[in-house]
A protein has these predicted regions:
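Bacterial Sec-dependent N-terminal signal peptides
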Residues: 1-12
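Mature extracellular/secreted ectodomains of secretory-pathway proteins
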Residues: 80, 89-133, 137-140
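Long terminal segments
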Residues: 10-64, 123-182
Length: 182
């Protein structure tokens, strides 16, 4: 999983991107190794769209937030911060899917926990899909990859600012739920 990096660290852009990609691959491997029934409830939060946005009319929505994806050193230790989140929801024929990866702050302050990767795969009302990947470092955009070969409505591509805003919102939801449930 991703090692904490102090703010202002002088890593090159290529090394930062490689670190993020490696961390994302590590998170995916850990999730594949654990089937949902076996995944410890204390290390995972599941929230439905009705709980997130009561009365909003969003259907079939679910957010999964995972803690402690790097259990190599202290398997019994529960991570205090979210590491990875994915959520889906549908509004009519429109489908939304997001993934977010964070790293832990060096100083243990949750306000300093930054997203490093944001992925979206959204399907518009014409059943056309667009994929978007943003890589961040210390809150700054490193790289953007957008695949819109199906020519989906561009409104379905979140901006980097929207991606960071969503990541912040989900981080707050995750940490509040973690506090309430412990």
């Amino acid at each position: 999983m991703l090692l904490p990096v102090a703010a202002g660290a002088q890593n090159s852009r290529e090394k930062q991107l490689a670190t993020i990609r490696e961390s994302y691959a590590g998170a995916m491997n850990m999730l594949q190794m654990r089937s949902d029934p076996e995944y410890p409830a204390k290390d995972k939060i599941v929230i439905t769209s009705d709980e997130m946005w009561p009365g909003s009319g969003q259907h079939n929505g679910k957010m999964e937030i995972f803690f402690g994806l790097d259990l190599s050193e202290e398997e019994s230790e529960i991570q205090r911060f979210p590491r990875f989140a994915r959520y889906t929801y549908n509004i009519g024929s429109q489908k939304y899917y997001y993934e977010i990866l964070w790293y832990d702050p060096d100083d243990g302050n949750p306000e300093h926990c930054q997203p490093v990767f944001f992925f979206s795969k959204n399907t518009d009302y014409h059943d056309k899909t667009v994929e978007c990947r943003y890589y961040f470092w210390d809150g700054k955009l490193l790289k953007t990859l957008i695949n819109n070969t199906q020519q989906a409505d561009e409104d379905y591509i979140p901006s980097p600012e929207e991606a960071l805003s969503r990541a912040k919102m989900i981080f707050q939801i995750a940490t509040m739920n973690k506090l309430w449930n412990n």
